[in-house]
Amino acid sequence: MNAVSMATPVFMILMAFGNLFGIGGCAFISRSLGAREYERVKKISSFSFWGAVFVGLLATLALTLGVSWILPLVGADASANIANISKDISGDAYDKLVQNYQNLEQYTRDYLFYIGVGAIPTVLSSAMSNLVKGEGAAKVSMFGMMIGAVTNIILDPIFIFGLDMGVTGAAAATVVGQLASLGMAMLFHYRWDKEIRRDWKHIRPQWGLIRGIYAIGIPAAIMQGLLSVMVLFVNLVFGTQGDMAEPLQAAYGIYYKIQPVSYTHLRL
């Protein structure tokens, strides 16, 4: 549970990068369609698509090859956590805490690795679900997210308990859920979409186009990214609390997951 809490903010940061291209591209596509600038729509969608792929590729490299540098940032570095154990704790209690922190580091490492392997579909799913909204296909976006969520819910117990994969099963289920969501968006793109493109010939950098996407995409990404950074910071602070660190981090992880439900109605 704690490993998932440690790694979830990283996953949300990936989603924020998807929003950078998705929400920015969505708004720009809507304006361009209204102005009947169809050639610009092709350029916007191509840039957003391949931009998301590129960022996802960088995230894959960072999370699979550089995970050892990321662990301290998310509060899962065993040596740092062990150093914060109170000197009043000794014997079996100390050994148990050391083992718990070592397990936490390994589980978080495994979870982040799987998230890294699935970084491209994660970022691209977030981007594409927003891009199709730009064409007015909000239902397609909604169904895609629902399919991804349901797939994740179904596969979690199968991977975690049925296949005895543990925390890596939770990560694998999350990645497969993102693939399912992306699959819905791509199905719409291939079968019914007439405007969104992903052709290389349309991704030549143009400052006006990039500025139009980032003008809306960057604020959207920052809003979600700052929330994840806040959670990372809180986990680091809790990590200094010695033997109380794990229960504090676990409790905050649960709160972080259910907290968005409390204001969902405000988005309606």
Feature-to-residue mapping (PLM):
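Short alpha-helical transmembrane segments in multi-pass integral membrane proteins
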Residues: 29-118, 162-218
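Generic alpha-helical transmembrane segments of integral inner-membrane proteins
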Residues: 17, 53-65, 120, 124, ...
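Small-residue-rich hydrophobic transmembrane alpha-helices
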Residues: 3-60, 122-141, 251-267
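Alpha-helical transmembrane segments of multi-pass membrane transporters/permeases
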Residues: 52, 131-154, 168, 172-175
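Helix-terminus/linker motif at the lipid-water interface of multi-pass membrane proteins
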Residues: 1, 71-78, 92-99, 158-164, ...
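Residue-level signature of transmembrane alpha-helical cores of multipass secondary-active transporters
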Residues: 12, 115, 141, 212, ...
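Interfacial/gating helices of multi-pass transporter permease domains
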Residues: 1-12, 103-107, 167-168, 209-216, ...
